[in-house]
Amino acid sequence: MDETRNKPPASQTPASHPPASAITEWTDTYFKRTKEAVGKFGDKKVTYAIFMRRPVVCAPRLAIEWLEAVARERGFDLDIVLNYPEGKWVGAGEPILYITGSFYHLVDTETIILQKLGPACVGAYNAFTMCADLPKTAFLAMEARHCAGTEMEEMMAYAASVGSDRAKRKVGAKGFIGNATDATAHFFGQKKGMGTMPHALIGYAGSTVRAAEMFHETFPELPLTVLVDYFGREVTDALEVCRRFPGLAAQGKLAVRLDTPGGRFLEGLDPPGSYAVLERHAPHSIRGYRDETQLRYLIGTGVSAAAIHFMREKLDEAGFPAVKIVASSGFGPAKCRLMAEANAPVDIIGTGSYLPERWTETYATADIIEYDGEKRVKVGREFLFRK
């Protein structure tokens, strides 16, 4: 098999579905019929060009690994030229990679290749912008519950790692330091997933402090991150937990997680109070025009920039400056950008909101540009020819 150029490093758990033997069940029927026709009239060596209609960050590893596995199983030679290494910015319409090989063996793989390439590239783009906008904030990938099955979960965890690595290289960002599940932890250099407690544990315990005690007694070796919004007393419960664990608080091994729902303000805040908080800490963020969504991120209900600043104020005033703040709840690219503008003092963000918001933007497209070395492509796609 020909050596793949600019090939990204192999993943430890490639998305192997479907195996070559099952491709016919999952590919578009017109590809299967084309394969039969090619089998009848003779094979040709073809070159595919694959591109996307929007800027992305190149995240091709899962698609390439799958196609290479198919080539090995079917026993045909495959040459892949990756025009943009993993983690590289790719402009709209630019061929991401060229795939050359037997038309007969490649034709029915197109459906699955596009599935594995497009969404990962958009997810990587989103993860990159989020990490780059908040370079001093660490991120945890919590996409698993938002995914349509384990294959998508793997794809999106991989995407987050690619975008994160780009942000680390470009701006020195902390980026994604881990994720929620064991199966995909390797993408972030971890052996296990990360996480502490859901709201369910607090409901079970009957109080925020008791839930923290239960967790710490069960996992005394782990840093303690405590959800503080269950009873609507974010500030009160956060300070109670800090007083219960003063040693952890002083050592920086205690964090409070804000996950206040969008139906109410964090304890102690309202619209005027939220404006006042940002006036103290980031007045520039509320001086210009803002639409309703931006205002919600800055001074609205839920986990706003004002809420994070307010919690930091209260922790510092009570003598707990080393206690970290973890934020979650809808932290996608737009919200992260506003957090950066407001200088929100958030230490860690747990999010799965780097997942593509508009699925139509994840559609990758493939066209054959050469048949037995002869350039030929449908009119309008000449820009795909090799330069």
Task: Describe the residue ranges of each PLM region.
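Gly/Ser/Thr/Ala-enriched C-terminal appendages of enzymes
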Residues: 2-32, 40-42, 58-59, 70-74, ...
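Residues in well-ordered beta-strands of folded domains
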Residues: 51, 81, 140-143, 227, ...
